[in-house]
Regions:
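Extended, intrinsically disordered, low-complexity segments
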Residues: 101-136
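Short beta-strand/loop segments at the ligand-binding rim of alpha/beta enzyme cores
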Residues: 56-66
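Short, ordered loop/turn segments at secondary-structure junctions
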Residues: 34-36, 67, 91-93
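Alpha/beta enzyme core
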Residues: 1-58, 72-81, 86-88, 98-102, ...
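Catalytic cores of large soluble enzymes that bind and process phosphate-bearing ligands
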Residues: 9, 88, 92, 116-123
Length: 136
């Protein structure tokens, strides 16, 4: 990923979100409230007050892109503030590749590919189950 200076980040405003929802009648709205796609070099800084205000003003379920690296505590709070869907693709990819690497190192050339892929898929399933539990 590319590093972006904090002052260059464009956050969703309540006014923009409200206007967009009214004009488009979307079912869900992805908002920019302090997360980014990819791996973090620091801690995600979710702007919870902004998130809650957007949720209250729009009344639609909100989507959080860049959920990889967001702490469980921040994620639980974001869910109470209107987040209904979280994208954690990078975290799933990292788990899948790491598990494949470790499994391939232990395998033999003539092993079935399933021997390598099933553990990787199970690692992704574990990540998703952990994230889904944050919505309860």
């Amino acid at each position: 990923g590319k590093a972006v200076a904090a002052e260059d980040i464009c956050f969703t405003t309540v006014e923009d979100a409200t206007r967009f929802v009214k004009e488009t009648q979307v079912d869900m709205l992805a908002v920019s409230v302090g997360t980014v796609h990819g791996l973090y070099t620091g801690k995600a800084q979710i702007q919870h007050a902004r998130l809650k205000a957007i949720s209250e003003a729009t009344g639609v379920p909100l989507v959080l892109h860049g959920g990889t690296g967001v702490s469980d505590e921040d994620m639980r709070l974001a869910v109470t503030e209107g987040i209904n869907k979280v994208n954690v693709g990078t975290e799933m990819n990292v788990q899948w590749v790491d598990r494949c690497k470790s499994t391939f190192e232990k395998g033999k050339v003539n092993d079935s590919v399933r021997k390598f892929l099933i553990p990787a898929n199970q690692a992704v399933t574990a990540v998703l189950m952990e994230k889904m539990a944050l919505f309860k």
